[in-house]
Every structure is written in structure tokens, then in C-alpha cells.
Amino acid sequence: MTIHWCGTGLSAIPGLRRLIIDGHDIVVWNRTIEKAISAVGDITKSIKEFDIHELKNCLGKGDIVVSMLPADWHVPLANLSLEKQSHFVSSSYISPEMRALHKEAVKANVCLVN
């Protein structure tokens, strides 16, 4: 199981650093590589430029996508997670679009957490 952590904004860094230091298998995805390297490059080299198509190629069944990206990315990432039978977590509220994915998530036996 790999955690695909998307976004390295200020609120993301403490939790992300803790997971990396604790030895979890994490791939850090960020829109700008330099910002991600500045945030966690001292403790991991597993940093990729965020691209939803590349994430799709790397995402496996049972993996976890953590989105610390802006809310407009949450539904596309949740849909990708459903397609790949992986779990999805965000720090956002439950939008009507996210709520609409609930039955599909139950059917796929994956968790969508907001």
C-alpha cells in the first residue's frame, strides 16, 4: 500500500513529514517540484510533479490518495481513486458532488473520507 500525498502547502507539511519519518511508503505529488523538495526533500526523494494522468499510472488497488490540493481537485481525484479501487482522503468538506460518489465507493469497497 502506497500513500500518494498530493499537495505540500503549509497545512500539509507536519502530517506528511510525520508519515515519511515513520517509514510509510509515500509518493509526494506537487504542482511545483521545488516547493515539495523544500518541504520534505531532506527526508525523501520520492517526489513527483503533480499530473493526474501520471498519478493514474502509479496508483494501485488499495493505495491511498491524500489530497491537500484545492477543493476543485477532490472530485476528480476521488473518481480516479474509485476507478483504481484505492482510498481517498481530503481535508475538505463533503460537497454534493462528493456525496454523490458514496454508493459507488461502498460498492467498490473503498473509503472516501472528507
Please place each PLM-identified region on the residue numbering.
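NAD(P)-binding Rossmann-fold cofactor-contacting core
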Residues: 25-40
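Rossmann-fold cofactor-recognition segment
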Residues: 43-54
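Conserved N-terminal Rossmann-fold NAD(P)-binding element of oxidoreductases
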Residues: 3-8
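N-terminal Rossmann-like NAD(P) cofactor-binding module of classical short-chain dehydrogenase/reductase
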Residues: 63-68, 88-90
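Rossmann-fold NAD(P)-binding glycine/threonine-rich loop
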Residues: 92-114
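Hydrophobic/small residue at the entry helix of a nucleotide-binding pocket
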Residues: 10-12
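ADP-ribose/adenylate-binding Rossmann-like module
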Residues: 80-98
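Gly/Ala-rich phosphate-binding loop of Rossmann-like dinucleotide-binding domains
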Residues: 16, 20-21
